Amino acid sequence: MSIRSDEVRDKILRGARAELAQRGLAVRVEDVAATAGVSRRTVFRYFDTRDALLAAAIEDSMRSYGDHVPRPGPAADLDGWLSDALVAVHRMNAQHGRVYFELASGAARGGVLGDIARARRTARRELVQRFTDTAWRLANGTGDPPDWVKDTVAVNLSAFATEALGPDFGRHPEEVGRSLARALAHAVRGAAADAVDQGHATTPPPGAPRRRRSAK
């Protein structure tokens, strides 16, 4: 594919992403063509079907989502990293718009859109797990983080959290990210402290006599 062809394809994908954010999966090829500034025929030169176009645009969105979430550097601290990461996440949630709510609804879908919906679900689970493990490490957590911490991370990263605090409370994505970062930092630190306390409660101090098992 030539440089010119790559540019046209990228323009079509950007148009599709913008329309998906506004209209969701009900978007028409005509809408994408108008936003991209090309003809409907040009769109079909690059994508055989409407579903193939939408799937490519959503896949492009998912790839950019992961690229925008910062990874902590060697000197990173929990509060700073959570703030940067959650601001990035909620910016992306706001940009992706309506289509992500539809994909997260759990509605049965077939064909390439069904494949993309399943891929999105898998990618989200992987992101939540990676995010949880990183936050736990930065909080000096011991052992594995409890499941409720992962659940809390999932809720705080969700596009539904962006939407809940956006229109109803007039918060910008940056404000949403910073607010939820503070809440999540408290939750993760609390869980890490609980894990230490439980470890002390179950581990006898050095030199303490071991409890003998009663004879059966």
Tell where the protein language model's regions lie, with residue ranges.
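DNA major-groove recognition helix of helix-turn-helix
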Residues: 16, 47, 57-58
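Hydrophobic/aromatic-rich alpha-helical bundle segments in the mid-to-C-terminal region
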Residues: 135-183, 191-216
